Amino acid sequence: LAPRLPIETVAAGGGSVLELQGERLRVGPRSAGAQPGPACYRAGGPLTITDANLLLGRLQVDRFPAVFGPTRDQPPDAEVVRHRFAELAAALGQTPERVASGALQLAVETMAAAIRRVSLHRGEDIRGGVLVAYGGAGGQHACRLADELGLNTVLLHPMAGVLSAFGMGQARQRCRQQVHLGAALSPELLAALPDQMERLM
């Protein structure tokens, strides 16, 4: 057995692509990634959860660094987001704001389903628990996610946007090595263990 952390990934992040599947809106699992990124990054990317947050005023464009576009000196492009959502909304017979809000709700439901699945699998009752939000967009969805899960408390660390990197930087360095012997336990195997351990050092 190899040591590992039980991590469940969910395709509902800021880069999750919004697209039509027949007459239904789909969120993820495809991601725009960092390149080209969301439509607002000015690199020709698709509509994403980030763009939905921007359209609904949950992202403050004037607070973003001007690092977008071909010369990397422009703010996020709110105009292209409005235009692209208008096209998507027309195809669905809805308003752009309703489509964006629906996309966020789909993302929250996807995240909530993953948390429920993991907690049920482990036999844990999360009622009365605390939802810890981290990541660049963690705070944008934490309260809606807590409501969806029936949780009353959300912990949003002041460094939530860089919490993973911060934790990695604070962790003690260590090296763990192992070898698979593929043999039945016997006196001969026990006698050979010191040599095997020496090779791992």
Each model region followed by its residue ranges:
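N-terminally biased helix-coil "hinge/interface" segments that flank
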Residues: L1-M201
